[in-house]
Amino acid sequence: MDLISVLPSASKSCVCLHKPLSSSTHKLKPFCKTIRILVMPRRWEFARPSMSLSTVASEDDIQRRTGGYLSNLWNDDVIQFLSTPYGELAYRERAERLIDEVRDIFSSMSLEDGEFSDLIQRLWMVDNVERLGIDRHFKNEIKSALDYVYSYWSEKGIGCGTKSIITNLNSTALGFRTLRLHGYPVSADVLKHFRNQIGQFVSCPSETEEDIRIMVNLYRASLIAFPVAFPGEKVMEEAESFSEKYLKETLQKIPDCSLSREIGDVLEHGWHTNLPRLEARNYIDVFGQDTKNMEPNRKTEKLLELAKLEFNIFQSIQKTELESLLRWWNDSGSPQITFTRHRHVEYYTLASCIAFEPQHSGFRLGFAKACHILTVLDDMYDLFGTVDELKLFTAAIKRWDPSATDCLPQYMKGIYMMVYNTVNEMSAEAQKAQGRDTLNYARQAWEDCLDSHMQEAKWIATGFLPTFEEYLENGKVSSAHRVSALQPMLTMDIPFPPHILKEVDFPSNLNDLACAMLRLRGDTRCYQADRARGEETSCISCYMKDNPGATEEDALNHLNVMISGVIKELNWELLKPNSSVPISSKKINFDITRAFHYGYKYRDGYSVSSVETKSLVMRTLLEPVPL
């Protein structure tokens, strides 16, 4: 359905001129080849979903399209009635004592572990503190342990200990994964030494728990793959195929237990949708439950207690931040914007799942606010606004002056001020963290994003279908990945001087790939619903136009191949050895990609938020872990 390009009479004569910025509008380059529990209301009361598509007449008598999206699931009462005891000092003091005790465990490894198990013991500790979500407390200990392991690394891998006579697939797979994730230069060729003549990585006729865990670690290692064009990386695909098949068959044979649940989690979330806090929540439930996972009890018990306490203590921080987010949401006039999706709680949850260090409150709140605003703008440009109104709004944003609202229809005035005030506030937060003014830099990113939305609105209004390449180049900008990441990222205690920022943000390949990932994955999940709302333009339709005779299935297969390639390119950009940019500086942008990918794993989780996304909120935000 075409948008109706009719302006209210009061707006027709208004001309908005914008103040130019010093930097020029960019175009993205193409991407490369018991306890007390959380006290809640007696009953959860979720707003009832509505999925009907409709056309409504606004106050100015213009027929406007609305998306019929699911309404907001999280009303004020759900948040305001949250209560948790874990903000009390006693819990924090206990956590601090446990942190010291775990440090002692790291320190004692050099004394207690024999030379036939010293390597696997160090890898076991590093892997488990990371999977349990408590690694931020042990950065020095982790580096020391991995330096030790790497000093014994060979082209054939490692054994369980420094005195082991032969190398071991379990130690090598776990070591390869952990070392690569921390930036050590390790080649995938090492896995070739564990294949037999028919391509099997290990023969497991008994299918013991130990054998199964070897395959779990091989599968986890295989997902940290670089593009196959790199030497040795072909074996990663073979390892993934072999171990995935083995684990899926194993799930059909073994009883329901913590090991089967661990396998299920690993297979379901892999690497690119395995958000760190969600992984921690899932792993807490299975850690230490199987006897083969029970290293000396002191280690397991201390790690598990600390992980549970840390998880619950952070929920007390989340409660305070959610209250702040709700105040912003109400004060910004968001409840009165009825044509859009309201997913501020879901976006906050995603931010909390990738940056749950207490000091990163600015990132979590900034990400939730930016994504909420971008969702409002997306629905306004795609559905509710007319082309002429949207031209006025785009020009008004470029003026960056509250008086620019004089040009706008009434419903746009509040949206404009929400953008204006929030971007300015985030810029002030970024200036505190980075020590320099980044407002003009951020404004340029927002302007580019709205220009790309404007282009899509024109395509929708005229029914024009661009080429696949033209659509994708514009779509990488309109995906809004850059805008959602930029300002929240700059509020963190990670330094982003200009020479580092350009390697993480535009014009870096990391940024280009992240934008491409969001556009490609989003279109594969949204194109049918978008088409039902009158939005014909998508990667799928443009590919089919460029390739006469191609079916939707052909287009989806092509996009999925592209997505697989982008994932490996992203891995390389994050982890390539000898990079001038620390992994910590790139990791947050990379993790934002993982968060968006999670939302689109099975469906458009931002429009249909009552399934996986709702479960994520419940599991990581609202439900505490029993101690």
UniProtKB/Swiss-Prot annotation:
Taxonomic superkingdom: Eukaryota
Signal sequence, renumbered to the chain: none
GO cellular component, one term: chloroplast
Gene name, Swiss-Prot/TrEMBL: PT10
Cofactor mode of binding and number, as noted: Binds 3 Mg(2+) or Mn(2+) ions per subunit.
Catalytic activity from the UniProt record: (2E)-geranyl diphosphate + H2O = (S)-alpha-terpineol + diphosphate
Broadest EC class assigned to this enzyme: lyase
Protein's job: Involved in defensive oleoresin formation in conifers in response to insect attack or other injury. Involved in monoterpene (C10) olefins biosynthesis. Produces 57.3% alpha-terpineol (15.1% (+)/84.9% (-)), 27.6% limonene (25.2% (+)/74.8% (-)), 8% terpinolene, 4.7% beta-pinene (14.8% (+)/85.2% (-)), 1.3% alpha-pinene (100% (+)) and 1.1% myrcene.
Cited Pfam families: Terpene_synth, Terpene_synth_C
Keyword Manganese: yes
Cofactor: Mg(2+); Mn(2+)
Pathway(s) this gene product operates in, as recorded in its UniProt entry: Terpene metabolism; oleoresin biosynthesis
A biological process from GO: geranyl diphosphate metabolic process
Binding-site positions, Mg(2+) 1: 378, 382
Subcellular location: Plastid, Chloroplast
Motif (DDXXD motif): 378-382
Annotated Mg(2+) 2 binding sites: 378, 382
Name by which UniProt lists this protein: (-)-alpha-terpineol synthase, chloroplastic
Primary subcellular site in the record, as a coarse category: plastid
The organism of origin for this protein: Pinus taeda (Loblolly pine)
Keyword field: Chloroplast, Lyase, Magnesium, Manganese, Metal-binding, Plastid, Transit peptide
EC number: 4.2.3.111
Cited Gene3D superfamilies: Farnesyl Diphosphate Synthase (1.10.600.10), Terpene synthase, N-terminal domain (1.50.10.130)
GO terms of molecular function: magnesium ion binding; metal ion binding; potassium ion binding; terpene synthase activity
UniProt family annotation: Belongs to the terpene synthase family. Tpsd subfamily.
